[in-house]
Amino acid sequence: EAIGYIQAQSEHAQELLDFISSRFSSPTLCGLLLGKAARAREKGVELYFDPACRLDRPFQPLGEQELISIIGNLLDNAIEATQRSPLPHAPVEVLIKLSDQELIIEVADQGVGIKPEIRERIFERGITTKTRGDHGIGLYLIESYVTQAGGAIEVADNTPRGAIFSLFIPATGTARQLEDTDYAT
């Protein structure tokens, strides 16, 4: 029975590795996603990656570290919100998709959700839904990175519970690219 469990875990890990490495070209992003999936699983939460996921070339409007920070913070928040839910843990759904027009990052959880009075201020520095620890910077950073790149963020309630964070970042013509062009002349 233990051998069967180990084989199943190994197969799952290999399938996830194959999926992620075939859809994301950045080794750093692949490492982040695999690490977050393993950490989530240890906490009793599964990450479900949408089959449409694809980021197979560098995304110029954001630096790799900014992209990693955005995705890492969104996943951490969703995993923690899911853990705090008293109901059985539904998977955290993840979509990271680059088209010619934009990069879409969407993370949907069925955790504890966001109270309306906090939602209005969720991107302010120091605002958090968490009760312990040093929090309140992640969403502030995400919002600043997305805004600098000329993008937008939508926060919605998930059904039947939880939250959906959707980020839309244009692939061209961003404020950052215009600044870079100014400095180059």
Label the model's feature ranges.
Residues 109:
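Acidic ATP/Mg2+-coordinating residue in the GHKL
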Residues 4-7, 21-43:
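Short beta-to-alpha transition helix within the HATPase_c
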Residues 146-147:
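Detector for a conserved hydrophobic position within an alpha-helical segment of the HATPase_c
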Residues 114-126:
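Short conserved segment of the HATPase_c
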Residues 21, 48-70:
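Conserved short strand/loop->alpha-helix "switch" segment adjacent to the catalytic nucleotide/phosphoryl-transfer site
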Residues 151-152:
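Conserved glycine-rich
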Residues 64-87:
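Conserved ATP-binding N-box helix of the HATPase_c
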Residues 89-101:
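Short beta-strand/loop element within the Bergerat-fold HATPase_c
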